């Protein structure tokens, strides 16, 4: 047991004794706050926040009361209890304590005027020689304000007034720790400014606090004047007060512009945060250094720890690696004094060591921090999150990618919070609170829109530099309802369609970003390094050039990877590892090693405190969309959040925006349609001849679904369309649009009869519907037990398909294979078709698209990674989303595989909402691959489906229709909806 642990345990024992002792045996009744408060504060100082919270609750229970009301001596324990919740990540509960404390101050506005202040020279603080690890920026003395001041009031005789205040007779003398009351009030005001952000100005407390602090105390003591300036300044940061808040805080850092005092550290911390937000890192660093030094002298360890964390962030963001040594000295000094300070210094020094590429030192420092945080008594989730983030950065810098991903996930887990604590990230908390206040009419629509727009905005350069982990947690958190509400507010305001399209696109892109561990940062770096420098925005080009100058191996590695890919593509397909040349194997091993190292380096860059715009996928622009559309094209896009659905239809010369009114009926209609065509069997399934009859039940349901989804204006736009480019969202990815009726009138033909249909992931990726036809030199088919139950028939069907495709190679999973590596096979193939079941759940990145050889290389999520070379044409008729089991999820099991393919180089893909299999799939797939040789993908799928309708199949050969009822006909026509309406053509090229 360390000395620090022994000290903390002794404090906890003392706290317990005080809690059970008689009031007469505790601190004298006139001394406030009670002794329990100071014991709890010591526990907080050493990082035992959970035990400290218990202590502050005990102090609250023993605090003075006036009738049923608390007095001002409850302010410190309330605020410090809030600090315990804040450190645990429970922003909501922390805010409750801060507000309760400030309400007490508002309820007792005259208490500060009852303080008996002696106008005398303040004693200088005895210098602590060992607190010299940083240079103080100003040559001022440091003075001690008496902690306990007399109040000419007896709170035991006080009575509440009708107005809610407190009236106390001047009889006895009470000793109150005024400096602690004021110091903790400054903490509460700062936290409200940070936690509430733009909401602070709309708080019911904002105006009363402004009024209270606008009235200066009657006392004229210089230290009290300085303290009041700090409180008023910090309060004004989160209000509409017409004052220079920063100047007030700056003036309050010194007593009469001469001496530092107990509130100087807190004021300097606030000034540093303001400068950091402005990007003035040199000034911020000076303020944080001074705050840490002074806080250490006053033994305000929480301020020391927070100042060091902020200092380290600014140092890393601005390249101040010279602060590495002082941070190490601070860590040594803090040993046996404060776990929170020591951990903050170690983590900050560790990150600076990583930027200096001294990974050995960084590893040593972070291991020391980990030992400190592993103690059972220490509970610092924010520090644990910071440690995991910094350890992840170290692992990526050392090319230990698996460890990096593990620690990153741990860091995000801490930062996202839990169902118990709620959101840890302020912007997420502000978003949810804004939605709640708007729903309860406590916030105007205009104010809510402004706040949501700020909270949901693309992270700024300053955000990435100061709080990269919090930004990543924010970007990887589902926020669909907030984006939908922002869209609704913009619609109510009468925003132009271009703005609405951009908001819809952001919601669609967010669905991709939230599923990626780095929130799209890796995609941004891959895009930046793979593209031409001239294609980047000037600010992004500057960042990339600086990174390449700092890490020149990046450019060389990228060029070498490209060379190796070209070399392997020119060689034979790696079908049999035993027949590969030594040179080919050597080239692939080098590529594999270099790619893994390159990905680690990209992750290292992505986690660093440097901004790079997330331009992949591109942001949407209505003029750009309309400019690309061909005559006869209609774009239809949706966004969905909860029970709210919005759609937009776009033609070259026309747009229409609408809200889907009856979403509950929409869900019921979709579920009914899937049941009526026989995909989901609840009770007796329809007979095949019933499902293909003109009066089949599903036809009426499809008409109802179409009428729910599309207003008359959109039906009119569709009537003259030749191709529909669909961009669904959420569970609308499961809708088989191809089988919806052509017109709003009953009995009309399905969409697929009248027009081609294609899909792209987001509005901003519309160019994926206008690609160029790729040159196909190698086609590869991978076939499992998919076309027939008996292997000979299945293999024969696969061979027929392969023979109809030029330059085709066939791999049968029923045979023993010696494929070297799925990744190698993927990069060497131009056209890939996989006739095998491919399970795709909510974690769709794990869908095993290449079920060969090394299992870890089979997942489609790896298609994003280096070497990012994917087959130009992909067919996955066996993709198996959760819809097959009757589960209507969030659509990620379709959306994410599409993103993986199209954003990694694939030009088009044919996938399925449900796997059909059997002989009908053999006929469809063969026709689809043949049509692709001469036609665009959307037209190829349409022609293949219509050709399928003319066929007759043995019911026994169609597993999706089995088991069948005894009265079923042995033959089933190819126009049975289950056999064709699940296929989707994703991505397209110009006509």
Task: Describe each region flagged by the PLM.
Residues 652-653, 729-790, 963, 972-991:
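Boundary/activation segment at the start of structured domains
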Residues 921-991:
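An often Trp-containing, charged/polar helix-loop segment at the C-terminal end
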Residues 52, 94, 205, 245, ...:
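Single-residue signature of alpha-solenoid repeat helices
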Residues 758-766, 827-927:
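Catalytic cores of nucleophile-dependent amide-cleaving enzymes
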Residues 682-689, 694, 710, 730-732, ...:
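A domain-level signal for caspase-like cysteine endopeptidase catalytic cores
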Residues 401-409, 413-416, 441-746, 773-782, ...:
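Amphipathic alpha-helical protein-protein interaction segments
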Residues 34, 76, 225-227, 266, ...:
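Residue register of alpha-helical TPR repeats
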Residues 58-64, 100-104, 109-110, 210-217, ...:
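Amphipathic alpha-helical segments of tetratricopeptide repeats
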């Amino acid at each position: 047991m360390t000395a620090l642990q022994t000290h903390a345990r002794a404090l906890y024992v003392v706290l317990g004794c005080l809690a059970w002792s008689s009031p007469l045996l505790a601190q004298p009744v006139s001394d406030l706050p009670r002794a329990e408060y100071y014991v709890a504060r010591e526990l907080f100082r050493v990082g035992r926040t959970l035990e400290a919270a218990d202590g502050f609750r005990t102090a609250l229970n023993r605090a003075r009361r006036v009738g049923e009301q608390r007095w001002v001596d409850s302010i410190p324990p309330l605020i410090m209890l809030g600090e315990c919740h804040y450190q645990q990540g429970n922003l909501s509960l922390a805010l409750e304590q801060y507000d309760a404390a400030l309400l007490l101050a508002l309820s007792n506005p005259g208490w500060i005027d009852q303080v008996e202040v002696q106008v005398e020279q303040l004693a200088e603080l005895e210098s602590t020689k060992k607190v010299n690890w940083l240079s103080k920026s100003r040559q001022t003395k440091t003075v001690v304000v008496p902690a306990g001041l007399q109040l000419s009031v007896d709170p035991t005789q006080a009575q509440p007034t009708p107005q809610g205040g407190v009236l106390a007779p001047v009889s006895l003398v009470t000793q109150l720790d005024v400096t602690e009351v004021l110091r903790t009030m400054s903490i509460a005001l700062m936290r409200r400014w940070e936690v509430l952000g733009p909401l602070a100005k709309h708080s019911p407390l904002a105006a009363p606090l402004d009024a209270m602090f606008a009235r200066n105390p009657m006392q004229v003591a210089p230290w009290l004047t300085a303290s009041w300036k700090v409180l008023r300044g910090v309060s004004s940061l989160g209000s509409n007060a017409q004052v220079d808040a920063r100047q007030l805080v700056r003036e309050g850092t010194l007593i009469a512009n001469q001496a530092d005092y107990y509130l100087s550290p807190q004021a300097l911390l606030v000034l540093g945060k303001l400068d950091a937000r402005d990007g003035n890192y040199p000034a911020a660093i000076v303020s944080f250094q001074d705050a840490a030094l002074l806080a250490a002298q006053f033994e305000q360890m929480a301020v020391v720890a927070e100042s060091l964390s902020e200092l380290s962030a600014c140092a890393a963001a601005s390249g101040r690696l010279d602060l590495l040594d002082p941070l190490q000295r601070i860590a040594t000094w803090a040993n046996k004094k404060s776990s929170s300070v020591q951990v903050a210094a170690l983590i900050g020094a560790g990150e600076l060591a990583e930027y200096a590429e001294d990974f050995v030192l960084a590893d040593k420092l972070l291991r020391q921090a980990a030992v400190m945080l592993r103690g059972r008594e220490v509970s610092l989730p924010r520090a644990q999150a910071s440690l995991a983030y910094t350890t992840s950065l170290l692992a990526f810098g050392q090319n230990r990618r698996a460890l990096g991903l593990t620690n990153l996930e741990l860091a995000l887990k801490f930062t996202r919070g839990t169902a118990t604590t709620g959101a840890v990230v302020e912007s997420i908390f502000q978003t949810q609170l804004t939605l709640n206040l708007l729903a309860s009419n406590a916030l105007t629509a205009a104010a809510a829109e402004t706040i949501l727009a700020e909270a949901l905005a693309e992270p700024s350069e300053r955000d990435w530099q100061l709080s990269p982990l919090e930004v990543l947690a924010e970007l990887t958190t589902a926020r669909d309802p907030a984006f939908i509400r922002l869209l609704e507010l913009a619609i109510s305001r009468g925003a132009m369609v271009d703005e609405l399209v951009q908001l819809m696109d952001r919601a669609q892109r967010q669905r991709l970003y939230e599923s990626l561990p780095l929130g799209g940062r890796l995609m941004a770096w891959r895009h930046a390094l793979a593209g031409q420098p001239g294609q980047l925005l000037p600010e992004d080009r500057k960042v990339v050039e600086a990174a390449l100058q700092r890490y020149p191996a990046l450019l060389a590695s990228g060029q070498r990877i490209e060379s190796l890919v070209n070399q392997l593509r020119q060689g034979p397909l790696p079908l049999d590892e035993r027949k590969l040349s030594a040179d080919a194997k050597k080239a692939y091993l080098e590529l594999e090693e270099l790619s893994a190292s390159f990905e680690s380096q990209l992750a290292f860059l992505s986690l660093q405190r440097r901004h790079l715009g997330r331009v992949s996928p591109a942001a949407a622009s209505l003029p750009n969309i309309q400019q690309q559309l061909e005559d006869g094209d209609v774009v239809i896009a949706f966004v969905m959040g909860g029970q709210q659905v919005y759609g937009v239809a776009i033609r070259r010369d026309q747009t229409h925006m609408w809200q889907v009114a009856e979403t509950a009926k929409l869900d019921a209609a979709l579920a009914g349609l899937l049941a009526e065509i026989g995909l989901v069997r609840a009770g007796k399934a329809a007979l095949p001849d019933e499902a293909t009859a003109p009066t089949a039940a599903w036809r009426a349901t499809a008409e109802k679904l179409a009428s729910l989804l599309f207003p008359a204006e959109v039906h009119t736009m569709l009537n003259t369309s030749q191709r529909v480019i669909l961009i669904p969202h959420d569970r609308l990815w499961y809708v088989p649009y191809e089988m919806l009726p052509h017109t709003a009138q009953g009995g009309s033909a399905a969409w697929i009869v009248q027009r081609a249909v294609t899909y792209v992931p987001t509005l901003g990726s519309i160019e994926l519907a206008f690609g160029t036809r790729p040159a196909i030199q190698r086609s590869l088919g991978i076939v499992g037990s998919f076309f027939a139950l008996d292997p000979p028939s299945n293999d024969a069907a696969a061979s027929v398909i392969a023979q109809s495709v030029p330059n085709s190679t066939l791999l049968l999973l029923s045979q023993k294979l010696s494929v070297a590596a799925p990744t190698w096979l993927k990069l060497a193939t131009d056209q890939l078709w996989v006739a095998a079941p491919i399970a795709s759940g909510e974690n769709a990145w794990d869908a095993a698209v290449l079920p060969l050889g090394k299992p870890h290389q089979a997942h489609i999520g790896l298609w994003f990674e280096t070497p990012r070379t994917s087959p130009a044409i992909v067919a996955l008729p066996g993709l198996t989303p959760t819809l097959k089991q009757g589960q209507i999820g969030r659509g990620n099991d379709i959306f994410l595989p599409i993103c993986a393919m199209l954003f990694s180089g694939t030009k088009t893909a044919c996938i399925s909402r449900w796997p059909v299999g059997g002989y009908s799939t053999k006929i469809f797939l063969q026709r689809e691959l043949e049509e692709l040789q001469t036609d665009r993908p959307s037209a190829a799928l349409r022609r293949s489906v219509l050709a399928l309708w003319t066929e007759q199949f043995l019911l026994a050969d169609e597993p999706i229709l089995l088991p069948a009822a005894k009265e079923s006909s042995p033959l089933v026509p190819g126009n049975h909806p289950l056999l064709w309406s699940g296929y989707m053509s994703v991505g397209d090229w110009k006509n």
